[in-house]
Curated annotation (Swiss-Prot):
GO terms for biological process: thiamine biosynthetic process; thiamine diphosphate biosynthetic process. Binds 1 Mg(2+) ion per subunit. Pfam families: TMP-TENI. This is Thiamine-phosphate synthase. 2-[(2R,5Z)-2-carboxy-4-methylthiazol-5(2H)-ylidene]ethyl phosphate binds at residues 137-139, 167, 185-186.
Length: 214
């Protein structure tokens, strides 16, 4: 059975938030007010000890607001905090190991443009899979851009929530009609605290309008 919470705007933090925790909390709260339903703390630098204070604070805010909180990669930290789940990439722990450690948690797996990897992830217990980069991405400029028809095929074959990621902005999000979540970084946080709520609402509105036409 699909987790019905896995839908909507999925915000992913920019790198280095743990170095500016007060701003990070403000950004998170503004995104939530704008309609963000899922948040992922993604910190590829810094130790678990350095990230722990911010992770705990953001998790508490998400819990109070009814927003899902996902940690990127850091499975041990996710277990110690008791957050909603983890997101794993190609170099992270396998979904099967994560499912053993998080029997009731959300496990997301990056599948890039690989449908076979998505099938394997589902078999190993993934809650959702992510495909991308959907468009050229300023966060990962070297990433290959996938064929968006992959989403329709995955929707037909997988029967688990699908997340689109990579280069998504208000001007192109309308092309993503066969996914459950849109994961964004740059287009959500650009402009800082004063702009985030507007960014979130704009992304959601553009996506919703185009999906309703289909």
């Amino acid at each position: 059975m699909q987790d019905m919470r896995l839908q909507g705007l999925y915000g992913i933090s920019e790198s280095g938030w743990y170095k500016r925790p007060h701003e990070a909390i403000e950004l998170l709260l503004e995104a939530i007010e704008g309609g963000m339903k899922i948040f992922q703390l993604r910190e590829k630098e810094g130790s678990d000890e350095e990230i722990l204070p911010l992770a705990r604070a953001l998790w508490n805010h998400c819990r109070q607001k009814g927003v899902l909180f996902i940690l990127n990669d850091r499975l041990d930290l996710a277990l110690s905090l008791g957050v909603d789940g983890v997101h794993l990439g190609i170099d992270d722990a396998e979904a099967s190991r994560a499912r053993i450690l998080l029997p009731h948690g959300i496990i997301g797996i990056s599948c890039y443009g690989d449908l076979d990897r998505a099938h394997k992830a589902k078999e190993e217990g993934a809650s959702y899979v992510a495909f991308g980069s959907c468009f050229p991405s300023p966060t990962k400029p070297a990433s290959s851009v996938i064929d968006l028809t992959l989403f329709k095929k995955a929707q037909e074959e997988l029967a688990i929530p699908l997340c689109a990621i990579g280069g998504i902005e208000a001007q192109n999000v309308g092309e993503l009609i066969h996914c459950d979540m849109i994961a964004v970084i740059s287009s959500l946080w650009s402009g800082g605290v004063a702009q985030v709520r507007k960014n979130a609402k704009g992304l959601i509105q553009s996506w919703r309008e185009n999906r309703e036409r289909v």
